[in-house]
Amino acid sequence: MRTIFTFILLLVTFNVIADDLLWIKLQQDPNMVVLMRNTESSGNKDGSNMLVWDETGNCVGESKLTKDGKAHANRIGEAFARHGITPLAISSPMCRCTETAKIAFEEYVTDPDLRQSASSNSQGQQKFLTRATNLLLEYRGKTPIAFVNHGPNIDSLTMELLNPGEMLVGSVNESGEVEVLGKIRIE
């Protein structure tokens, strides 16, 4: 029993140290990016309306953040503030992402090509990859980027699977590709 407790304690300590190192990189290193899915939305819970997008910005028919999702986005914003980091946020135009970005970071930029499309829509996926890469290249620099988007899109950029609200930390190279450094989880 004592061995198991010690192992768990070491594992927790290692995760805290790893998170701290990633926060330091975000504070100090250029060309950093945090890729994250939107926090919990109605669609994450029941699978409905995940591809619906109201181009007017009124969110009609779209999946929206739950109460827990809004609270989680707020905790993410607080974590960035505690570490003295004010990122430039880039968001999918779909409401669950713009809500996450607005609550966590207040201001954000968006583009219609950053939305989620059906996995069978290879043209939509290619538009996303091209636009995301161009935006990462355009905004890479001293200020870290917070890229709020959808699981399938982040997976296509990084080959990493994320849970809602989980954050993937990386650096953007000269080609606009993301070199993954690790994950930060804020409960």
Which residues are covered by each model-predicted region?
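Positively charged n-region of N-terminal signal peptides that target proteins for export
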Residues: 1-4
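Active-site-proximal flexible loops/turns
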Residues: 9, 45, 157
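N-terminal signal peptide c-region/cleavage motif recognized by signal peptidases
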Residues: 13-15
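Active-site-proximal alpha-helix that buttresses catalytic centers in soluble enzyme cores
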Residues: 20-120, 140, 160-187
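Charged, low-complexity C-terminal accessory regions
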Residues: 124-164
